[in-house]
């Protein structure tokens, strides 16, 4: 939209953005529908050059990644064992972030400081070993060390998630370059990673679209988890005939599987 506005206003396009501007002009004449006027009006019609991010829309800002979000490291959960008579909560480590809760998952007491408790929809980022960032959808748990819970009081969840994900490949390369036993990043790498922050009006308009979209994506992941658990619970019972299908036990003998002869 900024390129479109600049072209419409006759403002200069930076050389670095010339190819993109040409594509926008071609798209506008061939098939693309322009944004509604009220949305286009939210965007500037000029660019300004910055040392850290190159050309950005005029009036927008640049901040460090750890200025737009709080990256809270987890606990050494072995110091918080399950208490007598308590079922406890799963300990969320890198393995759980990557593969989910399993029988091998450790457990810790639920009586940890509230900020270390994880709920569905929280954004988790493993900063050591296998670097991953994703919304958590495996139910309540306790955040282990080597994982960040990513939150923000000032910016939407989708904004901090997408910008963390945007820098993920750079973080992975940093961790790989300095790996000894287990590669990792440090907090100063979060400070070095920069974020382009749009105007409040643009951010608000984007949030009205992307906020519900992200919540829908998380909801779909939760539904997939529920269906997976249902499948895992029912399949063994179906195979043994303990559960019937349309009122009949599922047959698994050789006669059932034998092809009919013509």
Predicted regions and their residues:
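Extended, domain-scale alpha-helical bundle/helix-rich regions
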Residues: 1-31
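Short, glycine-/Ser/Thr-/acidic-enriched flexible segments
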Residues: 70-73, 96-99, 130-132, 155, ...
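A generic secondary-structure signal for well-formed alpha-helical elements
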Residues: 2, 6, 10, 72-76, ...
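Proline-centric
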Residues: 55-56, 147-157, 173, 188-216
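Non-catalytic DNA-recognition/assembly elements of restriction-modification systems
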Residues: 37-76, 200-205, 211-247, 252, ...
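Sequence-specific dsDNA recognition surfaces
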Residues: 45-51, 66-81, 88-120, 143
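A short beta-sheet element
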Residues: 93-94, 113-170, 174-180, 186-187
């Amino acid at each position: 939209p900024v390129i479109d506005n600049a072209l419409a206003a006759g403002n200069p396009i930076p050389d670095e953005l010339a190819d993109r501007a040409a594509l926008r002009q071609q798209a506008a004449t061939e098939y693309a529908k322009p944004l509604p006027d009220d949305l286009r009006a939210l965007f500037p019609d000029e660019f300004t050059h910055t040392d850290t991010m190159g050309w950005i829309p005029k009036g927008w800002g640049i901040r460090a990644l750890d200025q737009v979000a709080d990256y809270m490291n987890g606990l050494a959960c072995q110091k918080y064992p399950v208490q007598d008579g308590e079922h406890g909560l799963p300990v969320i480590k890198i393995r759980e972030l990557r593969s989910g809760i399993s029988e091998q998952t450790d457990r810790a007491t639920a009586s940890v400081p509230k900020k270390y408790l994880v709920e569905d929809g929280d954004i988790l980022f493993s900063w050591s070993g296998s670097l991953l960032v994703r919304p958590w959808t495996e139910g309540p748990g306790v955040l282990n060390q080597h994982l960040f819970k990513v939150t923000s009081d000032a910016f939407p969840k989708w904004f901090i998630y997408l910008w963390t994900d945007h820098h993920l490949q750079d973080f992975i390369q940093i961790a790989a370059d300095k790996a000894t036993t287990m590669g990792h990043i440090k907090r100063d790498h979060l400070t070095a990673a920069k974020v382009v922050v749009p105007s409040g009006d643009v951010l608000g308009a984007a949030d009205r679209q992307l906020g519900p979209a992200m919540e829908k994506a998380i909801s779909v992941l939760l539904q997939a988890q529920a269906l997976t658990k249902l499948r895992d619970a029912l399949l063994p019972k179906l195979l043994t005939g303990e559960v019937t299908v349309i009122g009949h036990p599922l047959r698994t003998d050789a006669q059932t599987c034998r092809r009919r002869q013509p």
